């Protein structure tokens, strides 16, 4: 139907896609080194892109970044590596349906934690930790899909601390970080707060460049 805004998919409006910038970048890549641009790359991703992402997140080395086929694949790769049947996994309630389907296929035990206006209920998460070990917590920190909330900075610190103490991984699933309304950016990433190597961050260029490029990272 004309003039209908569809909420069925989390896709940017076509008029927001930077078509001219993508066209120029593609032309430059082909002009600078078309053989490399059109050949097989390395499995971890383009070295220049990995270095750019590492620098953006304050990481010491580009080899701490893996380029993926969107952020959903990043999550799938992480889950298949870390999780097995029966592992207790914290999920926000509500959460992104496709992520829940991937976790269900693995056979994890869901530990649903309700969302508040400033993100996940950390008190409820701490209560869940008292009931048994958690293997992973899946968190969408910014402009949550589908709830729309953003995790407060105070709660980010409160989440990072017990991850180290109780030895569980926080999967910071953050494809919407670059989409704030207004001039105020979202709070710092949990990755930047992590001192115990318990936060794994994923994001995507599907919302800012184009869904069709299918480029994300872990």
Label the predicted regions.
Residues 17-21, 182-184, 212-214:
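Short aromatic-enriched loop/helix-cap "lid" or pocket-rim segments at secondary-structure transitions
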Residues 36-167, 178-196, 200:
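Conserved core of the PLP fold type I
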Residues 191-218:
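Active-site PLP attachment segment
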Residues 1-44, 168:
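N-terminal "arm"/small-domain region of PLP-dependent enzymes with the aminotransferase-like
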Residues 9-11, 71, 149, 213, ...:
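Gly/Ser/Thr-rich helix-start
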Residues 10-13, 141-145, 207:
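Short glycine-rich anion-binding loops that position phosphate/pyrophosphate groups of nucleotides
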């Amino acid at each position: 139907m004309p003039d209908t805004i569809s909420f069925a998919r989390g896709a940017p409006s076509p008029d927001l896609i930077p078509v001219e910038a993508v066209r120029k970048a593609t032309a430059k890549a082909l002009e600078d080194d078309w053989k490399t641009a059109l050949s097989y790359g390395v499995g971890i991703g383009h070295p220049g892109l990995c270095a750019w992402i590492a620098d953006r997140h304050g990481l010491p080395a580009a080899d701490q970044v893996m380029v993926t086929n969107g952020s959903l694949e990043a999550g799938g790769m992480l889950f298949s590596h870390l999780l097995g049947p029966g592992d207790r996994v914290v999920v926000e309630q509500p959460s992104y349906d496709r992520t829940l389907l991937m976790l269900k296929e693995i056979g994890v035990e869901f530990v649903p934690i309700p969302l508040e206006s400033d993100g996940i209920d950390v008190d409820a998460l701490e209560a869940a930790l008292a009931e048994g070990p958690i293997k992973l917590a899946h968190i969408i920190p910014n402009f949550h899909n589908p709830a729309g909330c953003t995790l407060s900075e105070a709660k980010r610190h409160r989440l990072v601390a017990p991850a180290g103490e109780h030895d569980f991984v926080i999967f910071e699933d953050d494809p919407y970080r670059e989409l704030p309304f207004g001039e105020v950016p979202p709070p710092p990433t949990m990755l930047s707060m992590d001192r115990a190597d318990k936060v794994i961050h994923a994001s995507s260029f599907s919302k800012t460049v184009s869904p069709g490029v299918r480029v994300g990272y872990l």
